[in-house]
């Protein structure tokens, strides 16, 4: 066959002998080769243009794109794996510019998790995650809160949270209840947040999550599991009272802090059924964390007394679960539970009264923020 009888497989033109190109088993003219194929910037293999990966700056074959490159989580730019930056204990990739901004940013990424610093004494420590909204996801605003809370040492940090429309999450290092009340200046932090137009209760997005150290719940894993089973049983048994305490709407609870709905005659059976459901972390008592048990029950608040009352309630539940037997916990009525609360937990008692949850005594209810 003569060269002048060869046909371009793409456009059908008769091929000139000096401009015949073969690619992927097909003969092509030079114009079609340029229009329909490209060369991978990484391995320099030619590929069909329609199969090319990459971005406006890089052209890659599928293999190089999958195994040699990744995408910056923050800005979406394509980066080589060797050029990606990661925060500690995190597998989310960033380009250098975004990584530097994150390191300098007052609002850290959602996956940011520094080594915990424990404040206070005793065995029971509580870390809080408080979501605030409506005031903007502004580093300057976060810095103002950090300056108030972290005068001498880092006690809180701020994080991005995709569930929040126009704000961020305040996270504390683990603290004893006494430290939260008497040493941590939460009232000043909340007042400043409100002054910057943030809200927590008066939103459709915000929650207050309280983490309790698992190590305080028993001397070994078996004892800790027994204590956790009593916690889950208590929450299931007294669900109606706790929902009223939480201030969450039914829809909000179902989405962010669902009930296990596994109440049985014993705490162990209730706990087993709860775990068997595999509901993940969006449940009232989240069991997914290795080092903590997370209470996700509460709606967010920037009212100091409500915040402290929630901490005191979690502390009371945990102490009952640690110190009581299964039988004692299973027989504990709500009225007996609230009557156990010592007068020093004044915020909790006042809040229970305001919600008509304290032996029928009523206290005037204050406005939430």
Residue ranges of model-derived segments:
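Short Cys/His-rich "knuckle" micro-motifs
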Residues: 18-21, 39, 50-53, 71, ...
């Amino acid at each position: 066959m003569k060269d002048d009888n060869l046909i371009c497989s793409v456009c059908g033109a008769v091929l000139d002998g000096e401009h015949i190109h073969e690619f992927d088993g097909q003969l092509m003219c030079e114009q079609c080769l340029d229009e329909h194929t490209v060369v991978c910037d990484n391995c320099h293999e030619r590929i069909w243009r329609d199969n090319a990966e990459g971005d406006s700056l890089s052209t890659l074959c599928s293999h190089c794109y999958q195994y040699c490159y990744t995408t910056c989580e923050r800005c979406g730019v394509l980066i080589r794996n060797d050029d990606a930056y990661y925060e500690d204990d995190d597998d989310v990739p960033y380009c250098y510019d975004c990584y530097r901004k994150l390191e300098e940013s007052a609002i850290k990424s959602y996956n940011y998790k520094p080594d915990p610093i424990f404040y206070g004494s005793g065995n029971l420590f509580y870390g809080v995650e408080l979501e605030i909204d409506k005031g903007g996801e502004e580093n300057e605003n976060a810095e103002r809160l950090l300056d108030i809370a972290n005068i001498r040492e880092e006690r809180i940090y701020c994080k991005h949270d995709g569930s929040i429309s126009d704000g961020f999450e305040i996270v504390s290092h683990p603290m004893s209840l006494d430290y939260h009340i008497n040493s941590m200046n939460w009232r000043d932090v909340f007042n400043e947040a409100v002054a910057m137009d943030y809200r927590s209760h008066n939103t459709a997005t915000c929650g207050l999550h309280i983490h309790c150290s698992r190590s305080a719940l028993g001397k070994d894993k078996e004892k800790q599991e027994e204590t956790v089973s009593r916690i889950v049983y208590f929450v299931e048994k007294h669900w109606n009272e706790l929902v009223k305490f939480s201030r969450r709407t039914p829809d909000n609870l179902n989405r962010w802090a669902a009930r296990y709905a596994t109440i049985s005659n014993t705490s162990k059976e209730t706990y087993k059924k709860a775990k068997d459901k595999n509901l993940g972390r969006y449940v009232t008592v989240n069991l997914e964390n290795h080092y903590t048990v997370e209470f996700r029950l509460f709606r967010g608040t920037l009212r100091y007394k409500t915040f402290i009352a929630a901490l005191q309630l979690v502390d009371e539940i945990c102490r009952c679960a640690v110190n009581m037997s299964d039988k004692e916990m299973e027989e504990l009525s709500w009225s007996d539970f609230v009557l156990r609360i010592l007068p020093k937990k004044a915020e909790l008692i006042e809040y229970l009264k305001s919600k008509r949850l304290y032996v029928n005594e009523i206290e005037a209810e204050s406005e939430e923020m």
